[in-house]
């Protein structure tokens, strides 16, 4: 299983499955933060966008993710002040430029993006900017991997470990995969040769009867991670007791919340969040794809009702979603060839 959504796109973009022998199957994991966010959290965030005098700021890949009553872009069309930003600091600058408004930043991502949110909150506190808050949806990769390993559907032989997340947390947090579950894990880069080498390293471990954590991406990923980023996250965030993941259910200590020292900048403290629970559309099978039980084209809606132009599930919306990757690099190419 390649855990990271960026790896999924690289695998399909470069046609790597066609280069591998049939006995090697690549299974797509839950490493897309937009895809694993349940619809209820999206609705909670969009409820903030409907508040008077609120500017709702979000990354571009969130703008087309549907809640029950529409996407952020559709809320914008109905009159809500929804802005796309490229970083949390952009949202903070919005707050400085609009002192009469309250800016809520919809924070999302794994440990890759959490440090930038943490540093932005530290900056807001330092400058005393009070018309800014964060709706925190940062999730953690290690509890998700553990949930997959504990799943009764688990039929995996090894893991391609995430590249970007590991630049922050390092390789050490994955040791439990080999120690407790006897599965090899190799942290990989994103070039075709990186991924092929990572697959080769996993196969060598399996052939030799080993289960270890190895680092193919040593040119970028330090074994112990990024100390400055880890320190910032430790200051600003603490673990939630549990958090709901699309397809995986509730996972304990799998997401960050904003620490009490930064409560003045916590949207969940500043506003009355409804705490909506929503089930996914019945026909969509995002959960099974996220767990690696199904391939994207095995979903009944894939390529028919659910396309990038009209996405039903989050896996088709996000740039890192497995369904979007398969559609762009495999399904569309196959349709062109058959025509």
Predicted regions and their residues:
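Secondary-structure transition/capping motifs at alpha-helix termini
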Residues: 127-130, 209
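A conserved active-site cap/scaffold subdomain adjacent to cofactor or substrate pockets
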Residues: 135, 153-222
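Metallocofactor- and cofactor-centric catalytic cores in central/energy metabolism, strongly enriched
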Residues: 1-100, 114, 118, 122-127, ...
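Generic beta-sheet signal
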Residues: 59, 85, 106, 135-137, ...
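Internal helical hairpin/lid segments
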Residues: 196-288
